[in-house]
Amino acid sequence: SSEAFFIGNMIPTCIADDRAAAAAVMRKTLRGYAALPNYQNYWIEAGYEQEMRDVQQALGVRDAEALARAMSDRWLRDVTLFGPVAEVREGFEAWLAAGVKTPILVPSSISGGQMKAIEELMRAFD
């Protein structure tokens, strides 16, 4: 691979000791993306065919709970960063190791708005 070739990736991120709450925020954040056919096709190609078929079925019957269930833990772990600081930092390093030269962390918070999420992210990497 060429060193001049740029690979960047936006990664939804939620830092919280309460992993379940952080995962819930990530599922809510990704609902809109999961509803779009272009993202569904991308994730199918990336190996998440069952998840995206389940998403499509949930969307077809407008079942929000089924949609949340369709976004599996495996899928969520692979496409976002969430949980305690150490896990988020470890996940960030994994993205770098995979060849993503510029991971773009897009923060959300379980307990506040965008500014709170940015503060949490800055503290995590201070």
Language-model regions: role of each:
Residues 1-126:
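Active-site-adjacent structural elements that line small-molecule/cofactor binding pockets in enzymes
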